[in-house]
Amino acid sequence: MSLPDVQSTAPDVRISLTRVGVKNVRKLVEVGRPGKTRPAIFISEFDVFVDLPSSLKGANLSRNFEVIDEVLQQATSGDVKGIEDVCGIVSRKLLDHHEYADRTEVFMRSFYMMNRETPVSKTSCQEVINVYAHAVAQRTNGKPMVRKSVGAEVTGITACPCAQNIMKDHAMHVMEQLEIPEDKISAFFNEIPMASHNQRGRGFLCVETDGDIIVPLEKIVTVLKESMSAKIYELLKRGDESYVVMAAHKNARFVEDCVREMARRVVSTFGDLPGDTHITIRQTNEESIHQHDAYAERKATLAELRDELSI
């Protein structure tokens, strides 16, 4: 006995739908790494969508799960080069499985564990990185065109330059009142940065490219970490803590400075990517002496950033 295919019947209201699919599909993703015996492991959630024509009542959602599982098997065997490639292959295969769809879209949100070493005591610790991937496949003259993106959000520390300069002026006035020689004052400020209020900064970088290009996730994380006042660690011995605090206050940065530094590092790090590569950069600083957060953002193509930076 054949079962009725209700999804293939005509809907009562005949309009097309932009997105139909499933959200928050939890999967363990293992991506093989060249030269490594163990794969990179991502604890992930997927959102998977197709568009739906006005002639169909519903989409066959079980096909989405079949495609995801098939591609995850490829990833474990090393046939997939990165998490954006996972999304790209899924989006392309969805077009094969949903013959009525012209556009498919896949989102992936993951936790990625990285091993770290503290700067002074060399203590081993781990850090959880939020990583993201996205892909869109579109039928163009019968051939699917795929656009992919990969990104990460990294936490660091920033120190406010404004408050630091206020404290420096105050300290200089006190030293002058104590009749400390000018050369001694200059020597002190060269060695010891002044206090300031701090922020926990969250930097985000996303790189969007065409189908066959893979952007190393580790390079994205490095750009983000190097763009704030200092890196932070889950575990710090006293020597490490002193180092981090000193480093942050010797490198005080506004939220705007962080985004501009990210842009500079993106151009120098990913200079081999095509000019039409889309870059999204943003920084959120959670203020310690205010109740609000500070925020800055830049969206541009790589070519536009190169032109502005004259690189």
Curated annotation (Swiss-Prot):
Cofactor: Fe(2+)
Keyword terms of this UniProt record: Hydrolase, Iron, Metal-binding
Pathway(s) of this molecule: Cofactor biosynthesis; 5,6,7,8-tetrahydromethanopterin biosynthesis
Keyword Metal-binding applies: yes
Top-rank taxon: Archaea
Group of enzyme by EC: hydrolase
Catalytic activity, reaction form: GTP + H2O = 7,8-dihydroneopterin 2',3'-cyclic phosphate + formate + diphosphate + H(+)
EC numbers, comma separated: 3.5.4.39
InterPro entries in UniProt: GTP_cyclohydrolase_FolE2/MptA, GTP_cyclohydrolase_MptA
Pfam family, one: GCHY-1
GO MF: GTP cyclohydrolase I activity; GTP cyclohydrolase IV activity; iron ion binding
Site description May be catalytically important, residues in chain: 160
Cofactor remark from the record: Binds 1 Fe(2+) ion per subunit.
Its job: Converts GTP to 7,8-dihydro-D-neopterin 2',3'-cyclic phosphate, the first intermediate in the biosynthesis of coenzyme methanopterin.
HAMAP family hit by this protein: GTP_cyclohydrol_A
Assembly and interaction partners: Homodimer.
Family designation: Belongs to the GTP cyclohydrolase IV family.
Protein name: GTP cyclohydrolase MptA
